[in-house]
Amino acid sequence: MTIALGKFTKDENDLFDIMDDWLRRDRFVFVGWSGLLVFPCAYFALGGWFTGTTFVTSWYTHGWASSYLEGCNFLTAAVSTPANSLAHSLLLLWGPEAQGDFTRWCQLGGFWTFVALHGAFGLIGFMLRQFELARSVQLRPYNAIAFSAPIAVFVSVFLIYPLGQSGWFFAPSFGVAAIFRFILFFQGFHNWTLNPFHMMGVAGVLGAALLCAIHGATVENTLFEDGDGANTFRAFNPTQAEETYSMVTANRFWSQIFGVAFSNKRWLHFFMLFVPVTGLWMSALGVVGLALNLRAYDFVSQEIRAAEDPEFETFYTKNILLNEGIRAWMAAQDQPHENLIFPEEVLPRGNAL
């Protein structure tokens, strides 16, 4: 039996092909299909943040100033979260809360959901951009995989955590001092520094910084020279095709320092990828746990003994008292609508403060 294979011809004017050709053609700044997501989302997220920090107050949601117009500076300005009473509303401009009134939308905290959602999709689009470009030039997708770590942290902190709580109100506001305040909140209400997932995150970030410094210094130490002159390092020539540093020399150096060293570049660079990415992912998982109000380590026996014996204190019991102080102060400040009044006997006391 003979089977005839005919070549399938597509319409040369097919809209998808025209779009694909224009989006993926070689240009100074690659656009790609991912660009349809990342460019508008990044534009709106950054534009919303600059607009919010410049003009929009937090008086109606938090009871304080947060814009340059009110006297804040770069460190104290922020796009603040919506009020606690708005729960998890998307706060669309045309929604039932603002009803198309832009001024009211700003007063209710609409810029926060605007920046958070466009920012999240912008970051996801940037990861897809790396994946798309890597596929176009036949690279492995490890850049996109690595960038998934900061995306996981952003989504867990700004979206998943407040979704697990009573509203967007408990997410961080977009500002420098606002993030610091959120860190204090995490410590006071969740004892975050004693959480093992936070410990893994710190180990990953600081470990990656150490690996980066060691790696950069080692490569600089073992650069090849092409002569006796002080300024003839061929390694700084971008057109040099061959190796620019000696892995063998680096291996011998660290073998003498530590007794062990990386035997090849692939394992070395995979380790430099693995440490920060794993640390950030573990930290993101920990924040998801906090969204569900899961506890960190609780050394109850030390707390009981400290309560019974005034002379017994540990760094842990001192930190627990500090956390109580944070909660007592922040709850009343953050939720003025609750009219929280704490009697003297519930405020932190003892020799820790």
UniProtKB/Swiss-Prot annotation:
Fe cation binds at H215, H269. A plastoquinone binds at H215, F262. It is a multi-pass membrane protein. It is found in: Plastid, Chloroplast thylakoid membrane. One of its GO terms (cellular component) is chloroplast thylakoid membrane. Chlorophyll a ChlzD2 binds at H118. 2 of the reaction center chlorophylls (ChlD1 and ChlD2) are entirely coordinated by water. NCBIfam families: psbD. PSII is composed of 1 copy each of membrane proteins PsbA, PsbB, PsbC, PsbD, PsbE, PsbF, PsbH, PsbI, PsbJ, PsbK, PsbL, PsbM, PsbT, PsbX, PsbY, PsbZ, Psb30/Ycf12, at least 3 peripheral proteins of the oxygen-evolving complex and a large number of cofactors. It forms dimeric complexes. This is Photosystem II D2 protein. It comes from Populus deltoides. The lineage of its organism: Eukaryota, Viridiplantae, Streptophyta, Embryophyta, Tracheophyta.
